[in-house]
Amino acid sequence: MIMFCVQCEQTIRTPAGNGCSYAQGMCGKTAETSDLQDLLIAALQGLSAWAVKAREYGIINHDVDSFAPRAFFSTLTNVNFDSPRIVGYAREAIALREALKAQCLAVDANARVDNPMADLQLVSDDLGELQRQAAEFTPNKDKAAIGENILGLRLLCLYGLKGAAAYMEHAHVLGQYDNDIYAQYHKIMAWLGTWPADMNALLECSMEIGQMNFKVMSILDAGETGKYGHPTPTQVNVKATAGKCILISGHDLKDLYNLLEQTEGTGVNVYTHGEMLPAHGYPELRKFKHLVGNYGSGWQNQQVEFARFPGPIVMTSNCIIDPTVSAYDDRIWTRSIVGWPGVRHLDGDDFSAVITQAQQMAGFPYSEIPHLITVGFGRQTLLGAADTLIDLVSREKLRHIFLLGGCDGARGERHYFTDFATIVPDDCLILTLACGKYRFNKLEFGDIEGLPRLVDAGQCNDAYSAIILAVTLAEKLGCGVNDLPLSLVLSWFEQKAIVILLTLLSLGVKNIVTGPTAPGFLTPDLLAVLNEKFGLRSITTVEEDMKQLLSA
């Protein structure tokens, strides 16, 4: 059987249409796993439909609220490739739905939900049979009837909500809960399960998702800073230190904290990878002296870099790619919603098996000459610099700020972002976040009167800090955010980037430049609408874009 998936930047694009619709997607996801993820999403939409109904009776089931976004997160690009676990999530969704339904019926014997997913049952235990059942729920099943524009808007909403669900799970892990957010999530998820086909309603929904995600990023920021302190500028070594070692990748700071606690005094050093780099800025994480540095570059290079790492690797969230290609699958471990067939999975917070493996491996034989980069420009630090920025602008020492961030990826056109960073004029500042920074974060940019020209604000969700800074600057200057000497040049790859974009658009931020390509699910008509309404456009050449942005 074949699949249909068009959710990430590397999706197949042909004159006949966009999307991975073969036996395997470009990410390595098989048709079986992709189809079963469609089935899981349908089950989750049915669960959300009953969660909406339950709230009408004052019933709030926290098990449902915590499970639903987490399971949805498992369908995000490069997270879970393990078909049996995807089916397990679907079964759990249905069990929770039935329990919630029973609670509703206990209050009102006539309780009903008008949603096509509300009574979904799995037809078999056989994966092949379930894959055939999943064909009912493939996202483009009614494309001929609704057209590409409606399909594209549905997918914009679905993928945007998926990105928000990922951030909801990150916040939940840190003890953050907001009933209004979960109520809104369930309402949108259930509505998407009705196969909506009204263009205006879908556009409004996409903005609602963006506004909701701003709240999600706020509680995630509160969770991270509440537990680990406010990030402050910190130098991080990106070269090897002699000794036994463990590499931890992903976004989950709690997993990193637990690993650091359990490795303390064992002689095992811990390195961050990918989106875990900003962890070094948090006081409660950097206090561990055996958190010795950051290893590697963008996630897309992991098959080469992980093969060279002389210790075990822990994947806490996206992005994992096939570890069997370079034969390190015997020393990579998955956590939480992450999965790869045949790779060992850690069900809880006990990292002892990983630590034992690290102690049995060679580790790095010698320390390399250190190369230090600076991270840790979190929300509090950025706000503390607001007056300095305004002073530099007023004295014409600072001409422009470029927010140059987003996802990284393998496409060759992404060298644009390296080239762009290198030609930013000396009187301009680069604010960066997310893993796209690996395209230029080891380069030297100097400073403007002591203020670094490259300011690393953190993970992708730390777009929240950048937004708060922009709002603060606008308030102090008595203008709108769009009137600031600020340009956003964003790289996208997957669904977290989609919801960050929706968040910015929902807040009224205009004239964003994105690349390296437009999302495959957005038609020329939809791109034209976004351009007309928000000034959103794709990158052209580095020189042309720089000229246009500086003259705006």
Curated annotation (Swiss-Prot):
Modified residues (Cysteine persulfide): 407
Primary localisation category: cytoplasm
Localization (cell): Cytoplasm
Endpoints of the signal sequence: none
Residues that coordinate or bind hybrid [4Fe-2O-2S] cluster: 251, 275, 319, 407, 435, 460, 494, 496
Cofactor-binding details, from the entry: Binds 1 [2Fe-2S] cluster.
This enzyme's EC code(s): 1.7.99.1
Enzyme class: oxidoreductase
InterPro entries the UniProt entry points to: HCP/CODH (IPR004137), Hydroxylam_reduct (IPR010048), Prismane-like_a/b-sand (IPR016099), Prismane-like_sf (IPR011254), Prismane_a-bundle (IPR016100)
Keyword match Oxidoreductase: yes
Organism superkingdom: Bacteria
Protein purpose: Catalyzes the reduction of hydroxylamine to form NH(3) and H(2)O.
Name assigned to this protein: Hydroxylamine reductase
Origin species: Shigella boydii serotype 4 (strain Sb227)
Upper classification of the organism: Bacteria, Pseudomonadati, Pseudomonadota, Gammaproteobacteria, Enterobacterales
